[in-house]
Structures are given as C-alpha cells and as structure tokens.
C-alpha cells in the first residue's frame, strides 16, 4: 500500500466535494477546482466527511498513481480553503517590479520593460519594488507562474542578481583571480 495514498483525506466544514465517475470537483470559500483522476484509481466518499483513494492492484504504475492522485485531491481541498502563495525576491541594481492593474511590469536590466499578465485564477501582490508574491487556489498554476517569472532573469551565480524564490539559497561562484 502506498504510504501517502492509503491516508484518508479530511474534508473540512464549508468544503463541498462531488465525485462524478473519475471527475472530482471541490468547492470551497475561495473558489472551485476540478480534477480527473487517472484510469485505475478510485475516489470514494466515506463517513464523517472523509475521502478515500484506492487502487485495484499493486502494479508499479498503479502504486505511483495512487499516491499522486491522493495528493492532487488533498491539494485541491487545501487550495479552496487556504489557497497557495509563492514569494519571490528581486535583487540587483535597478531591478524592480511594479503593479499595473492586475499585471506586473518588471525592469530587469533589459532595454525594455517586461509585462506579465495574470492568468485566470492567479493574483499578484507587490509588497515592495523588490518583493512580490503569486497567489491562487491551484498549487500547480501558482508554482508554474512563479517559475516563469523567475525564468525572466535567473539568479546570477557570481553576484546573485536576478529573480529568486524567497528563502532560496543561490550557490555562489568565485570570480576569476585578479593580479
């Protein structure tokens, strides 16, 4: 049995879960999400607001899908109740971000400003010109948008300039030895 997959998923009060065949729909105070579970995996409602994820046999692929499916459904429930957030920091001379409506405008050392539009379900919060956070209910989408923003100017290993995740440690390199 998958250690992650066999754990039941607690459904908090205020969250409505509907299972229609392989499709699991979760509705909560922050919004709603749907996910189609992979073919051999079954999701069922138990008593006391508990969801159980089961697999038909112990094939290697089914074991992997079992834990994955359970985690994806649990992430949906967490997303519609608490939401997800990914913090980013910008370091470097003249590097900054500012909000333009629901979009972001970056100055990252290029000859032009970079404009990022907020995808559906994602909001940006700019705390300062060097700190921002990406927020939403879908964990995968929040992580993807944050990774795309980081990709605009990855941290430089020599001076650690660029866009990085909050708390990320940049492995520094020693520059060439001067005479």
From Swiss-Prot:
MF terms (GO), sorted A to Z: rRNA binding; structural constituent of ribosome
GO CC annotation: cytosolic large ribosomal subunit
Xref: PANTHER family: 60S/50S RIBOSOMAL PROTEIN L6/L9, LARGE RIBOSOMAL SUBUNIT PROTEIN UL6M
Family recorded in the similarity comment: Belongs to the universal ribosomal protein uL6 family.
Organism: Streptomyces griseus subsp. griseus (strain JCM 4626 / CBS 651.72 / NBRC 13350 / KCC S-0626 / ISP 5235)
SUPFAM superfamilies: Ribosomal protein L6
Alphabetical list of HAMAP family matching this protein: Ribosomal_uL6_B
GO biological process, one term: cytoplasmic translation
NCBIfam families (alphabetical): L6_bact
Keywords: Ribonucleoprotein, Ribosomal protein, RNA-binding, rRNA-binding
Function field: This protein binds to the 23S rRNA, and is important in its secondary structure. It is located near the subunit interface in the base of the L7/L12 stalk, and near the tRNA binding site of the peptidyltransferase center.
Protein name as annotated: Large ribosomal subunit protein uL6
Keyword Hydrolase among record annotations: no
Xref: Pfam families: Ribosomal_L6
InterPro entries: Ribosomal_uL6-like (IPR000702), Ribosomal_uL6-like_a/b-dom_sf (IPR036789), Ribosomal_uL6_a/b-dom (IPR020040), Ribosomal_uL6_bac-type (IPR019906), Ribosomal_uL6_CS (IPR002358)
